């Protein structure tokens, strides 16, 4: 663990009871909490949002906040503050969320509604240029000919932050498992910056704050390059990152060597968590101090995994919450 931030007591330690959901520490780390909506909450939520198909959420963006309010009301208005406090808490910042009874690809639309409600209790999901919507659904199969590692099954997708090649703020990332067939392996990989043993070395390097060019492949539907440093600081001066090895474009030998060494130091960290995410569950993480990736799959001719992602910015009343507390 890095000396910059120690794990503090979290909301789970208080023994607080919540209405409509349960909250426990994950088996992988006290930084990652597991939130489960009860069967009754799930049933009532899906009944109350049934009048709006997913297309309505796509066309009318205010409905995304309305379904969020419905879910929060069903949880006695305890859900929204819990989500924000957890995601803004540097000692935590990550949740594995599921709803009892939502665990089959036939419920894909219900999954999108649930994830949308949760995301819009903490902020707003950005436009995803790859899909043309506020969310993206994509499939991983046994054979892939795409132009990035996103869908390639037989190799590790290295740890990274999202939103590195766009100008929009990307405070959070939501990653949901919609379907899985003939799958072995492929766990989500997570690394909290303060558990990365090499953070001090790279954060204090002269190249850490140099603006670098980030460019996306054609499949991302983003044609404009963006420039920013790999490292920055939050409001309390603690390290945050905007990094992905596939899309950063070093301008010279010095940057190329440093980035290569940085990548190796991240991928070999002893602080990496391997987290299984069953169908219907989703990870919600603070994108500024958590890196995420994916382990490799065992080959199978009929391998299939469908995922849904949302990523966006935090929006909350500043008199109630402190950024990156």
Swiss-Prot record:
Binding, Fe cation: 160, 162, 292
GO molecular function per UniProt: ferrous iron binding; glutarate dioxygenase activity; oxidoreductase activity, acting on paired donors, with incorporation or reduction of molecular oxygen, with 2-oxoglutarate as one donor, and the other dehydrogenated
Cofactor(s) it depends on: Fe(2+)
Entry's EC annotation: 1.14.11.64
Cofactor stoichiometry and binding remark: Binds 1 Fe(2+) ion per subunit.
Keyword tags: Dioxygenase, Iron, Metal-binding, Oxidoreductase
Alphabetical GO biological process terms: L-lysine catabolic process
Record text on subunit structure and interactions: Homotetramer.
NCBIfam families: PRK02963.1
Function: Acts as an alpha-ketoglutarate-dependent dioxygenase catalyzing hydroxylation of glutarate (GA) to L-2-hydroxyglutarate (L2HG). Functions in a L-lysine degradation pathway that proceeds via cadaverine, glutarate and L-2-hydroxyglutarate.
Stated name of the protein: Glutarate 2-hydroxylase
Native organism: Escherichia coli (strain SMS-3-5 / SECEC)
Lineage, highest ranks first: Bacteria, Pseudomonadati, Pseudomonadota, Gammaproteobacteria, Enterobacterales
């Amino acid at each position: 663990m890095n000396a910059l931030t120690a794990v503090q007591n979290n909301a789970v330690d208080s023994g607080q009871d919540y209405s409509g959901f349960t909250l426990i520490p994950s088996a992988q780390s006290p930084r990652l909490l597991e939130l489960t909506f009860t069967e009754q909450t799930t049933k009532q939520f899906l009944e109350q949002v049934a009048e709006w198909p997913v297309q309505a959420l796509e066309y009318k963006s205010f409905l995304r906040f309305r379904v969020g309010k419905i879910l929060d009301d069903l949880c006695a208005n305890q859900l929204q503050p819990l989500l924000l406090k957890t995601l803004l808490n540097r000692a935590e910042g990550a949740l594995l969320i599921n709803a009892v009874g939502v665990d089959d690809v036939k419920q894909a639309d219900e999954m999108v509604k649930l994830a949308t409600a949760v995301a819009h209790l903490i902020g707003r999901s950005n436009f995803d240029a790859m899909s043309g919507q506020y969310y993206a659904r994509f499939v991983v199969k046994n054979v892939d000919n795409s132009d990035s590692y996103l869908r390639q099954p037989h190799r590790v997708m290295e740890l990274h932050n999202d939103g590195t090649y766009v100008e929009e703020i990307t405070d959070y990332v939501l990653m949901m498992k919609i379907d899985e067939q003939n799958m072995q392996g492929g766990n989500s990989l997570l690394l909290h910056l303060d558990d990365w043993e090499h953070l001090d070395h790279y954060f204090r390097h002269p190249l850490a704050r140099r603006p670098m060019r980030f460019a996306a492949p054609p499949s991302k539907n983003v044609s404009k390059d963006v420039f920013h440093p790999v490292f920055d600081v939050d409001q309390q001066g603690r390290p945050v990152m905007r990094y992905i090895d596939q899309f950063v474009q070093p301008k010279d030998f010095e940057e190329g060597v440093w980035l290569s060494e940085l990548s190796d130091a991240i991928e070999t960290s002893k602080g990496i968590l391997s987290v299984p995410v069953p169908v219907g569950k989703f990870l919600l993480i603070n994108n500024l101090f958590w890196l995420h990736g994916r382990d490799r799959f065992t080959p199978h001719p009929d391998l299939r995994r469908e995922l849904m992602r949302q990523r966006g910015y935090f929006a909350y009343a500043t008199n109630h919450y402190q950024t990156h507390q």
